[in-house]
A protein has these predicted regions:
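Nucleotide/phosphate-binding catalytic cleft detector across ATP-hydrolyzing
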Residues: 1-15, 19-204, 221-223, 232, ...
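Extended, folded domain segments that form the structural surfaces/walls around functional sites
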Residues: 10, 206, 295, 302, ...
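Short glycine/serine/threonine-rich phosphate/pyrophosphate-binding segments
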Residues: 16, 210-215, 325-326
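Glycine-rich phosphate-binding loops at beta-strand->alpha-helix junctions
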Residues: 81, 159, 258-260, 311-335
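Glycine-rich phosphate-binding loop of actin/hexokinase-like ATP-binding domains
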Residues: 200-241
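Short hydrophobic/aromatic-enriched beta-strand-loop microsegments
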Residues: 224-226, 337-344
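Glycine-rich phosphate-binding/hydrolytic loop that grips phosphoryl groups
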Residues: 342-357
Length: 357
């Protein structure tokens, strides 16, 4: 029964992941199979640029899932993230005859008007209502209030139309139909953030290979979403500039890399070995890694809108491959001065029952 099986494909900055799950009676999902394909040939910074290769990649993932499930897959959910997305604020104002009582129809009209906004080369993928302003009072639920002016504040999540077209073409080439597209960062937030964190205010930082995604929540509402075109691969490339291949640089990053080292703990005579013959100065290595991770963390903090910077009772939640860098919490604290930082470990974060209904 197809309804029981759910297949999601998530396009990351360095890999495409296919996840097959079975829906349980309580709405939860049991993950049955996970397949990952290297996507460096077809996706750059989360944007499809080679349609044929992406199509081949998708076909390969679907075939592997079919083999594991022994089941025919005809449609998939697609998680979108990466640099094709960004968020913008929008305000819609409606002047009303004096003492009009606001109805839910008026609210729906406001939301529709927001959804019908056009942006050059971009499409609205999702919209989060921030708040309403009734005359001069802010309200989250203004229905039933008398007013002569109603204003809606929205956060629109946009993505590039070209990206959408390329993605559709890639799926057409693989012969799979898209059941629904969803925003990977929102699905991730649903999976890893607690209600208390979203309510009290928090920043979710997803450190990817080529991109870092920042989501800000307050009072249970998404307030900002941004994708920074920097990630773990930038650190690797910087290490490689010390005259070594990227695979060696990646191995050294995992072995020696640290986001923060006390100056007194740096031994000027210590060398880190690349292989049997070659080594690099530990100080140089430490400085290179720190410079880049500091740049990424500063960019992350810069993305947090100033009106929410002091409303983060839930703190900062780190996820993605880059969170495994040693002392990453210390580095974040140095820049943000926020003490509450936790790492969210998860295996497959994609499918939550809200996407599967």
């Amino acid at each position: 029964n197809m309804a029981e099986f759910i297949v999601a494909i998530e396009l990351g900055s360095s890999k495409i992941t296919g996840i097959a799950g079975k829906k349980n009676l309580d709405g939860s999902i049991s993950v049955l199979a996970v397949v990952k394909e290297d996507a460096t040939q077809c996706i750059r910074k989360g944007v499809v640029y080679n349609i044929d290769k992406t199509g081949q990649c998708l076909t390969s993932i679907i075939n592997k899932l079919r083999k594991q499930l022994k089941y025919e897959i005809s449609q998939v959910y697609v998680g979108v993230g990466g640099q094709s997305i960004r968020s913008v604020r929008n305000v819609i104002v409606k002047d009303l005859p004096t003492d009009t009582i606001i109805t839910s129809d008026m609210i729906n009209e406001l939301m529709d008007a927001n959804r019908n906004m056009t942006y050059p080369d971009q499409e609205i993928l999702d919209a989060a209502t921030q708040e309403y302003k009734v005359d001069n009072q802010y309200s989250l639920d203004p229905v039933g209030i008398k007013a002569s002016r109603l204003e809606g504040n929205f956060l629109n999540i946009l993505w590039r139309k070209a990206f959408y077209d390329n993605l559709n073409n890639s799926f057409e080439k693989s012969g799979i139909s898209i059941a629904e597209m969803y925003l990977a960062p929102l699905a991730l937030a649903d999976a890893v953030l607690s209600e208390a964190e979203k309510r009290g205010g928090c920043v979710l930082v997803d450190f990817g290979a080529d991109t870092t995604t920042v989501s800000v929540y307050y009072k249970n509402i998404l307030r900002h979403l941004a994708v920074i075109p920097l990630g773990g691969n930038n650190i690797t490339k910087d290490i490689a500039s010390l005259q070594m291949e990227e695979k060696d640089a990646e191995a050294m990053k995992l072995k020696y890399g640290s986001a923060f080292t006390e100056n007194n703990d740096i031994d000027n005579t210590l060398k880190y070995s690349i292989d049997a013959e070659r080594s690099v100065d530990s100080r140089k290595f430490i400085e290179i890694v720190e410079a880049r991770i500091n740049e990424i963390v500063e960019n992350v903090w810069y993305q947090v809108p100033s009106e929410y910077a002091d409303k983060l009772l839930g703190g900062i939640i780190l996820t993605g491959g880059g969170m495994n860098l040693k002392n990453i919490e210390r580095c974040m604290r140095n820049t943000t001065h926020i003490d509450k930082i936790r790492k969210a470990n998860f295996v497959t974060h994609t499918i939550s029952s809200s996407n599967a209904d």
